[in-house]
Amino acid sequence: MSRFFLFFLQLLALIVLVFSCQEEFIPATVAGPHPLVVEGYIEAAGERSSPPYVFLTRSFPFFSQISGEEFDDFYVHDAEITVSDGEEEYLLTELCFNDLTPDQREIAANFLGRNLDSLGINLCVYLDLSLSLFGEEGKTYTLSVEAEGETLTAVTTIPEQVSLDSVYFVEPPGEPRDTLAQLRVILDDPPEDNWYRYFVRVGDDAFRRDNFSVFDDRLFADERLEFPLNRPLAPGESFDLSTFGLFRRGTDMSLKFLFIDEAHHRFWETIEFAASNQGPFSNYTRIATNIEGGLGIWGGIAASYYERRVPDL
């Protein structure tokens, strides 16, 4: 038996010993209490600015199996949720999908960018039904949640946004594909730190995010940058390398480009990293949050919308 082979066996035995002696890592959310989860936003987008809305749910244990019956108890009801802009405080009202008329359901689906009928659950959201508060750039908003004996708070600021210089389509790189086009944008990045996110809608579909929808300007601060944006895969669409990220010519495209703050960026960055880091050898990822007393995100958004028809190039 060669010395190299003996060394290899010794090394392998050492690796097995080291890993077998490691203490099992159990995330705190498995053994401890299960905090409430907030997903809330307020958006500044000119005439398309939106009032605040908040989803309030219960968290599940990390290794739990979730059944349809448990989803009936997923949403937290009868919470007192307020949003303050530093001058006034606004009370949000709970509204559930099953309580809406068909016309109201369609409006809610378009507003939230979700096909609510396909979810199979009674989605509930807290809204400013008075439409008294809309997002404004540069303003700070404080969220307060009182539910099930718990108090949750969070603060977000809507950044000042800069419009994209150009939004256009080009021939895809690589082999010729006369039915497809690539979306590209030009951004003049402001000198301060900036964090971005984007959504895309094709035709009358809902706005959808790419698997890597957030990015920052650490590598191109205060520069003029041209870069592509992918078309997200539609639900049920299989991955095809030859068409991935590309748009079919002759279709209508809407781009929603977001300026967000650092905490908002960090939340989605960890969400998307966890989603892409799956498999038997993946690591447990702790999702970032700006919610004091709970989990989730309270995010301010400065958004610009761009409508384009994919041309025949």
What are these regions (language model features)?
Residues 1-9:
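Bacterial N-terminal signal peptides that target proteins for export
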Residues 10-11, 30:
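Generic hydrophobic-segment detector
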